[in-house]
């Protein structure tokens, strides 16, 4: 492990030298690539330097144990105790930082939320989830762009698809995919009975065209008249677009914009990411049906998380974490959940690494 860390530090120092060069600065494409490589290494190199400094301090204080002055020996003894207590934590941090990175972690995401079982209440919950993720994005300084939305009669969403763009979005939200279950008294419930409904969430890394090989011959593009709200524009022009990727059968439709060109661009953005997701899951031999693998069926019994409003309780069933701060979570304070899921994933990866060695 330490030989690898030494090599990373040398690489980091080499990058710093290159970045200080006027020649590199004048080549903006190269400068951006080197800046990103430098930023990717900074955290692990900073931690390694702290570790080396602590080890040096430990050695220095051990030498002081032979000093003739009693007070100096006592101070050295206390320092040694403090350093030895802190070393395991930084060693664990270094092990985590050396874990192989998910190449998708830096990407933006496509967030898809669909109402599952529970009728109109499920569509209202889908809207609540979208608001929760939007608030979290605001806290993180990310941007949210709605690509497609299908409204329900009560002001919820049957389905909504959005692009969330910013720093390392996928690394933070990739664990949100699955069925989310809600337990609460609907506004329309006269008897005050608690109902259970569900919504599915799918988080996919935003794919660029270079990530996926999609040939024009693989696409069938249909245009049709938009339906739903829209005033005089509705049914006047064929602005809605439906794109089918023939090899996979993936279909994406968009009618939110008045321009057929804009609808096509939005639909292609979603399609490319769905095809990439399907290719990745097929490559990992998860299952043939990529969409079902990602989110489940939307049935209440298949859930990754439960939101219990009467008890203000939120439980993530994958890691057995329960928090009694549902109101804060729904206002976008997702960090305690996300941090716990990231830590769990890192711990599992370390266990797998140890088992393999």
Curated annotation (Swiss-Prot):
<dbReference type="Pfam" id="PF03462">
    <property type="entry name" value="PCRF"/>
</dbReference>
<feature type="modified residue" description="N5-methylglutamine">
    <location>
        <position position="232"/>
    </location>
</feature>
<dbReference type="InterPro" id="IPR050057">
    <property type="entry name" value="Prokaryotic/Mito_RF"/>
</dbReference>
<comment type="similarity">
    <text>Belongs to the prokaryotic/mitochondrial release factor family.</text>
</comment>
<keyword id="KW-0488">Methylation</keyword>
<dbReference type="GO" id="GO:0016149">
    <property type="term" value="F:translation release factor activity, codon specific"/>
</dbReference>
<protein>
    <recommendedName>
        <fullName>Peptide chain release factor 1</fullName>
    </recommendedName>
</protein>
<dbReference type="InterPro" id="IPR000352">
    <property type="entry name" value="Pep_chain_release_fac_I"/>
</dbReference>
<dbReference type="GO" id="GO:0005737">
    <property type="term" value="C:cytoplasm"/>
</dbReference>
<dbReference type="Pfam" id="PF00472">
    <property type="entry name" value="RF-1"/>
</dbReference>
<dbReference type="InterPro" id="IPR004373">
    <property type="entry name" value="RF-1"/>
</dbReference>
<keyword id="KW-0963">Cytoplasm</keyword>
<dbReference type="InterPro" id="IPR005139">
    <property type="entry name" value="PCRF"/>
</dbReference>
<dbReference type="InterPro" id="IPR045853">
    <property type="entry name" value="Pep_chain_release_fac_I_sf"/>
</dbReference>
<keyword id="KW-0648">Protein biosynthesis</keyword>
<comment type="function">
    <text>Peptide chain release factor 1 directs the termination of translation in response to the peptide chain termination codons UAG and UAA.</text>
</comment>
């Amino acid at each position: 492990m330490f030989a690898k860390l030494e090599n990373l530090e040398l690489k980091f120092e080499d990058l710093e030298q290159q970045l200080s060069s006027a020649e590199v600065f004048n080549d903006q494409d190269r400068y951006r690539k080197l800046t990103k490589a430098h930023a990717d290494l900074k955290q692990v190199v900073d931690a390694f330097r702290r570790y080396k400094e602590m080890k040096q301090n430990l050695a220095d204080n051990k030498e002081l144990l032979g000093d003739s002055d009693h007070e100096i020996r006592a101070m050295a003894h206390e320092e040694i105790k403090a350093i030895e207590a802190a070393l395991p934590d930084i060693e664990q941090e270094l092990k985590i930082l050396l874990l192989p990175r998910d190449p998708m972690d830096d990407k933006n995401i496509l967030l898809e939320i669909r109402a599952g079982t529970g009728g109109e209440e499920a569509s209202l919950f889908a809207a609540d989830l979208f608001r929760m993720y939007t608030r979290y994005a605001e806290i993180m300084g990310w941007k949210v762009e709605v690509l497609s939305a299908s409204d329900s009669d009560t002001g919820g969403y049957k389905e909504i698809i959005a692009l969330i763009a910013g720093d390392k979005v996928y690394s933070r939200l990739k664990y949100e995919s699955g069925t989310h279950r809600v337990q609460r008294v609907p506004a329309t419930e006269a008897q005050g009975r608690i109902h259970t409904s569900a919504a599915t969430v799918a988080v996919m890394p935003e794919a660029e065209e270079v990530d996926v090989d999609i040939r024009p011959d693989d696409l069938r593009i249909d245009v049709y008249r938009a339906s739903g709200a829209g005033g005089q524009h509705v049914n006047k022009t064929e602005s809605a677009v439906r794109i089918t990727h023939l090899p996979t059968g993936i279909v994406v439709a968009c009618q939110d914009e008045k321009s057929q060109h804009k609808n096509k661009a939005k639909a292609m953005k979603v399609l490319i990411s769905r095809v990439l997701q399907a290719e990745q899951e097929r490559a990992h031999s998860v299952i043939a049906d990529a969409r079902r693998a990602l989110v489940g069926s939307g049935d209440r019994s298949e859930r990754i998380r439960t939101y219990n409003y009467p008890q203000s309780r939120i439980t993530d069933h994958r890691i057995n974490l329960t928090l009694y701060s549902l109101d804060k979570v729904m206002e976008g304070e997702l960090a305690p959940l996300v941090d716990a899921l990231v830590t769990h994933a890192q711990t599992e990866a370390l266990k797998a690494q140890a088992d393999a060695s």
